[in-house]
Amino acid sequence: MRDSLTVEIVRVRQENPEVTTLYFERPFDFMAGQYITVFIEGSQVREGKAYSISSRPDEKLMSITVKNVGGEFSSYLCSCQVGDTLHISRAYGDFNPQTKQPLVGIAAGCGLSPIWSILADAKQPTFLYLSQKSPEYMVFSEELAASSIQVNKFSTRQQVEEKNGWRNGRFEVANIVSEVPSNAHFLVCGSLPFVRDVWQKITAAGVDESHISTEAFFEQ
């Protein structure tokens, strides 16, 4: 933690039963889609744990969105309250393709965090395909509803009425590729198995690897 910055949590929002978003004053500039490392004092994991920034670069508050998987870091962060402090690194990462092409985000769960930051900051046409257990596990509901992003939400574990962008079951990647502009750039984020599977299916549908950006989450 020698070169870490200390920030104070000023807001805590419970996104769903498993996911919490922590807000703190933005201590530096960053590019949409980047992440920071969070350090826990006294942890055996001295290198810390990386978390994507879920806020936009132009917002006063910076945020990270954490799913509680029962590990040391996620349990600690999801128990934080307003007034607690965090030790963080500066932002890094190159998930953002910095292109003017249409953007297509494909995310599962908290994999939406960096994709939301990029799509919300984009000026070009944007499309989002989001896999969630059910509507109750949706994250960033208010922000997505207020945005101009074309959102397609898939409930994988609970049958829902197919309205307000919701569909049942898992999405078919080949259908996504056929639905979006042919020159689109794809952003894929979620668990490693999810990212690997979606990447393989996008390329199998004829999309060149140079038009795909990926980022995988590891639970801790």
Where are these regions (language model features)?
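FNR/FR-type flavoprotein reductase catalytic core
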Residues: 69-220
